[in-house]
């Protein structure tokens, strides 16, 4: 019986004495282990690509390859998280600028006419009020005992308006709240202008925001990303306004399609971004990772297509 604590070492750099135990476990490949199912599932995320038969590794697969796969996934998550951060900041800036200009109001977030009326979610049956949701977030942060520094400065310096200006309020929103705020805008013109900045139709943009929130949470919780089949699939981009990819890459439930979304959005934020070279460097650092599981397609000859030759990535 192997102590369950060895599983935790896959969440950090492996230390010498646990290394032997993990090798022994992998060689035995027994599920008679005193560990909960979530722990086994987490490990299995890195095992499955190397198994054609359940509980049996393919010939030639060693512990180093499994560990490399984990490290590759960790570095991929860090890269993705960094990209999402840059895009998220740009979305905040664009929404603040566009809406303040369209309504000639630095406090547009306090105008209920900017948002759709309360409605019932067709899936959950829950009542949704975008305006009131935003106001609750603002009130919670403005009345907190230890608010953000910029909120404290506003509260100590100004008495009216009660709420800070929009560019401060937007900094209080999580990615998910930002996504819901965009969907809750009443005027198509407002949504269109924000989406146009990123070269997208509003419907596609809102769908991508939803997926980006989902992936951000995956990264934040250190979950396996590289070969994940997405529960929240992004819309397929059928009418790109900028360079995109051939239809073979439209495997939108896999990670490479999401990486392509990040690249497309980053071009609007910084045309000279280095995502192509960073991703290529990561692939070269871990040459044994089966990247076909990320959603990179093969040609008729069965050979993986060269993603770097696609207009989006070149």
PLM segments and residue spans:
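Long, contiguous internal "core" modules enriched in hydrophobic/ aromatic residues
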Residues: 6-14, 19-314
């Amino acid at each position: 019986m192997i102590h369950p604590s060895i599983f935790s070492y896959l969440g950090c750099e492996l230390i010498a004495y646990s290394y032997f135990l993990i090798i022994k476990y992998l060689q035995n490949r027994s599920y008679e282990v005193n560990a909960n199912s979530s722990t086994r599932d987490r490990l299995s995320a890195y095992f499955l690509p190397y198994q054609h038969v359940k509980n049996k590794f393919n010939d030639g697969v060693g512990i180093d390859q499994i560990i490399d796969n984990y490290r590759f996934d960790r570095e991929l998550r860090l890269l993705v998280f960094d990209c999402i951060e840059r895009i998220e900041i740009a979305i905040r800036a664009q929404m603040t600028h566009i809406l303040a200009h369209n309504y000639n109001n630095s406090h547009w977030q306090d105008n209920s006419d900017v948002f759709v009326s309360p409605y019932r979610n067709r899936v959950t049956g829950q009542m949704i009020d975008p305006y009131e949701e935003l106001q609750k977030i603002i009130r919670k942060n403005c009345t907190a005992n230890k608010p953000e520094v910029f909120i404290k400065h506003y509260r100590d310096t100004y008495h009216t308006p009660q709420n800070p200006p929009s560019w401060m309020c937007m900094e209080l929103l999580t990615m998910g709240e930002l996504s819901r705020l965009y969907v809750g805008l009443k005027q198509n013109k407002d949504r269109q202008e924000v989406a146009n900045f990123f070269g997208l139709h509003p419907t596609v943009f809102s769908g991508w925001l939803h997926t980006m929130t989902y992936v951000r949470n995956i990264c934040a919780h250190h979950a396996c990303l590289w070969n994940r089949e997405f529960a929240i699939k992004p819309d397929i981009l059928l009418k790109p306004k900028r360079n995109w990819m051939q239809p073979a890459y439209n495997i939108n439930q896999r990670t490479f399609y999401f990486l392509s979304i990040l690249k497309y959005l980053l071009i609007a934020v910084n045309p000279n971004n280095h995502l192509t070279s960073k991703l290529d460097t990561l692939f070269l650092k871990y040459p044994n990772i089966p990247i076909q599981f990320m959603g990179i397609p093969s040609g008729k000859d069965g050979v993986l297509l060269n993603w770097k030759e696609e207009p989006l990535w070149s």
